[in-house]
Amino acid sequence: MFKQLLAKCIEGYTLTEEEAYEAMMMIMSGEASASQIASFLSILRLRGETVDELTGLVKAMRNRMMTLDYEEEAIDTCGTGGDGASTFNISTAAAIVVSSLGVKVAKHGNRAVSSKSGSADVLEALHIDIQATPEEAKRALKTKGLAFLFAPLYHSAMKYAALPRKEIGFRTVFNLIGPLSNPARCKRQVIGVYSTQYAEKLAETLHRLGSEHVLLVTGKDGLDECSISAETDVVELKHGEIRRFTIAPEQYGLARGKLEHVQVRTVQQSAELLKAVLEGRANESAINIVILNAGVALYAAGKAATIREGVEMAKEAMMTKKAYEQFERLRMKEVEKYA
């Protein structure tokens, strides 16, 4: 069956949502060989994925993932990765700021693939627990307001695609659908996208999948974050409506900075800069890029009515050390209490 779907793609046809779903289910059950998976990913990348295909692939991925049975509303700040900019972990820092203001954050992430430092790598360097089970993650959400959902734990069926992805070495559709498959089924997200051409497709896909409020952001300097050194293209899905606009740091009283001031070479440098930001002693560009991204996330979460209000809330959380106190809370180890 996979051969037939592959042949259809090679002949220039696109897959229906149902066919894409079937293809993904076969990949995740080990029915497709490594070379077939590599061919499939290469063809989709070359011609571009349709919304039907993206929807089918995400539905299958969600079908096979381990879910977090968490009833309260939570937000995710996650990116496609692969922007090649080697920045510190901005979305992780923003997640800490957002969670310090009472918003539950189910942070979906992984180890570094193309970047210098994945969110799992930097959290380990900072001695912040990565929850090993859904039960631990639920407890962390309840007691600390932030849980880290380590992607390989929740998406174990993706193991069959690991080798072909590594061997072909370029970004594939899996970079796009990973952030759309949060185990907590977050309906509110900020998703950093490495290329703005994909943002509208992803917004339409999320609309079909029932998301409520999602902002897909791409810096004009190529960042898969809201940038401090350039304008940022935003595609917003809100209650079924999709609109596109551009934001700039100056709109929110933030000075335009330099990209090199938020770049790092190692996991340790990323961890040190993230900690310095929350302590308020980092460079202005690093502090402001976290404030901007946290502000956008607070808006997506519904905590703030506008991005401007979200930015002001994030500034205050930084100035009052509320964000740093949350950082220290996350680093505290839980002590088991026995009756």
Swiss-Prot record:
Task: For this UniProt record, give its keywords in alphabetical order, as a comma-separated list.
Answer: Amino-acid biosynthesis, Aromatic amino acid biosynthesis, Glycosyltransferase, Magnesium, Metal-binding, Transferase, Tryptophan biosynthesis
User: Key word rRNA processing present in the record?
Assistant: no
Binding residues for Mg(2+) 1, per the UniProt record?
Answer: S91, E225
What is its cofactor?
Answer: Mg(2+)
Q: Where does Mg(2+) 2 bind?
A: D224, E225
* Keyword presence, Amino-acid biosynthesis: yes
The Gene Ontology CC terms held by the record are: cytosol
Q: Name one GO biological process term.
A: L-tryptophan biosynthetic process
The chemistry this enzyme catalyses reads: N-(5-phospho-beta-D-ribosyl)anthranilate + diphosphate = 5-phospho-alpha-D-ribose 1-diphosphate + anthranilate
Binding positions (5-phospho-alpha-D-ribose 1-diphosphate): 79, 82-83, 87, 89-92, 107-115, 119
Binding-site residues for anthranilate 1, renumbered to this chain:
G79, N110
Residues the entry annotates as binding anthranilate 2: R165
The Swiss-Prot or TrEMBL record annotates one GO molecular function as:
anthranilate phosphoribosyltransferase activity
Q: Report the co-factor binding details.
A: Binds 2 magnesium ions per monomer.
Top-level taxon in the UniProt lineage: Bacteria
The biological pathway it contributes to is: Amino-acid biosynthesis; L-tryptophan biosynthesis; L-tryptophan from chorismate: step 2/5
Give the Enzyme Commission number: 2.4.2.18
Stored NCBIfam families: trpD
Main function: Catalyzes the transfer of the phosphoribosyl group of 5-phosphorylribose-1-pyrophosphate (PRPP) to anthranilate to yield N-(5'-phosphoribosyl)-anthranilate (PRA).
Sequence similarity? Belongs to the anthranilate phosphoribosyltransferase family.
Oligomeric and partner information: Homodimer.
How is this protein named in the record?
Answer: Anthranilate phosphoribosyltransferase
Organism whose genome encodes this protein: Geobacillus sp. (strain WCH70)
Gene name in the database record:
trpD
